[in-house]
Amino acid sequence: TGVKENAFNYRGDFDFVMGEVGVRLETAMQHASTNVPSGEMPYLYDFAKRQQTLVQVNPAFVKRGKKAGLKMGLRLAAEFDELEDNVYVSPDVSADLLVAEGVLFLEGGITGEIMPSTYRGIMEENPYVSPDLDVKTAFHGVRFFAGVTGNFTQETSFTARVAYNVFHDEHFFVNRTFFEGSPGADEVHNNMFEVLYDDGRMLEVSGEFKLRFSQQMDMLLKGTYYGWDLDSLEHAYHKPDMKVGFRMNYRYDEALSFFAGINLLGSRMAKVPGLENGEDAVALKAVYDFNLGAQYRLNSRWNFFGELNNVIASRYNRWYGYPSFGINGRVGVGYSF
């Protein structure tokens, strides 16, 4: 794209403990800056340099017992951004309880989350965005959550979680459009993406179940449901209504292991102006991906891996206008320091 980004991240947590009570101070800073090409295709792109810095300080009172824990604090942050400066304040309250050792664990609370969008992060999320796109920070100011983790037996474990988010400036990908000729002429659909913003609420329900058949074989089933309620937009464009994953792992010996998995990405809506039926949105079918892989661990440092994706060669559109089909794979070498 011709855009270069430099980034720096810092995080430091400090605990001052006196017996079962204490004070915790979480600090973090994220900085990213972009250098952009000048005068490149001005009729299509409007490049602008961007500097964004987010400074976070989260003070909290904590109490830790043998079976229960409590945290009461705030999340405070200041953002200095070429797009807009912001100050964020959200609660940071949580509690947990160990009902039975190795059997049942409960947790819940109210917190918030700041979600800055760097140039690299957006490109990784959607590789087909317009190269001149800068995306604002999303703020999930209030997030209620509750969860349970447990074991039915030594071979089975599960996790269930529910969360309700109230957010501001969440982004949704839509196809960028432009006009042929003068403004007011027919709108032309482009194959690059930009974003629309909206405030709203989201219900998130997730679960995970793991079963170990033997020392060599286990399976994992997990899924998440998303329920969007937006203030202005009709749909949460390109956001799935669910994600489901299933994976089987088999360890042949200490060095060689295999896996097989199926991933499901639920249906999504794409905003497409000018459809013949008068609508401005189209439904994208669910994505099914069956994959296989293997890993060979040569020693404690070196490993080799390979995987095949979309083994059944299904045709789908993760992003509107970009059909994917056919088998694809990758091989690689890993080294641990």
Model-predicted regions and their roles:
Residues F14-E20, H31, K63-G65, L97-V99, ...:
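Beta-strand elements of well-folded, non-transmembrane domains
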Residues T1-A7, V36:
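Flexible loop and strand-edge segments within Gram-negative outer membrane beta-barrel domains
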Residues G39-L44:
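Flexible coil/linker segments and helix-coil junctions enriched in charged and small residues
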Residues G69-F337:
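Exposed, low-structure sequence patches enriched in small/polar residues
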Residues K4, V17-G19, Q51, R64, ...:
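Solvent-exposed loop and beta-edge segments used for protein-protein assembly and interaction
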Residues F8-F14, V21-T27, V55-P59, P91, ...:
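One face of beta-strands
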Residues R24-A32, P37, A48-F80, S214-Y225:
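Surface-exposed extracellular loop regions of Gram-negative outer-membrane beta-barrel proteins
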Residues F47-T53, D85, R201:
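Short, contiguous, pocket-lining structural segments
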